[in-house]
Amino acid sequence: MRNLVLFTSMILSFWGCSSDKDFGGLENIGWNEKPLQITTRILTTKSTNFIQEFKEGSMLGLQITSGTVDDLYNGISTYKNVSVKAYRVNGKIRWQQSPEVILDSNEATIYAYYPSQEDINFNARQIPVKLAPNALETDDYMYGTHAIGQKAVNSTSPLVLLSMNHALSLISFQLNLSKGKTGAFIISSVQVGNKPGGTTLVSEGTLDITTGDIIGSTARSTSASTVLSLTNPVTLINEKYCDPMRLMVIPPSGTIGTGNVETLFTINGETYKFDIPANTQWEKGKKYLYKLSFNGRSLQLRDVSITDWLPGNDEGLIGNIM
């Protein structure tokens, strides 16, 4: 019921503002045809560096189909990898399509992904995904389709609410000082990667926008690591945990073996290692929070929590996520 109410309210809001901006000439469409209208919802966390909503200039890619992802709507070839760009109109995001999608009485199913990519050999089941060495440069890859409660999309009901989901795993760390430890310890960077010669994590892969699954490229796995260099270094001075430090990774295909994935913290210029526990499985759209204590010589795991990557009050977090 909540989803239906949300969807209905968004429709009313949209049509109430539909005259705010005309994105193209509609004089050539038939009397029983209407242009597709798009609105979006992201399941994410709040942070100044993590996207809470799409901003002006954001680009989505759409696959306009008659049901399955490879069955293009009415057989129209230009409805493959349609580019849509976000514009802000009267304080609200509107989406401009290129080319514009025209609906008739036939029902359409829309698949979406972020960020949009131009590819002459586009395959909706094989969108290139890359883990950047610099954590701040990794895109928050997303996939989505109609939200729960969505009515059939056609010329009678041309507005689609796309629910976008995260395809990567979000890994967070909070550190404090062990009980009785004194002094100031400054964290300047965090790195997550394979052990030397390891192949558990991958740095590249392909995303299936219908499922969100990523098939990793093992040829690029041994160098898979990502580093978060802190613009504002974190200082540990007592038993209070610091704000979370967050990085995204491509979910591994299986569980993590003993010592196969390691985290390296630079503290006061020295490197300290924490091995991700054995039998851990990082999944798409999940958040993993590791709480660690530092005694001046090593790191001890205090707690691990796993939650869905959903809206939450995570103010002041460090990272670069959509």
Language model feature labels by segment:
Residues 2-7, 14-322:
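Sec-type signal peptide cleavage vicinity
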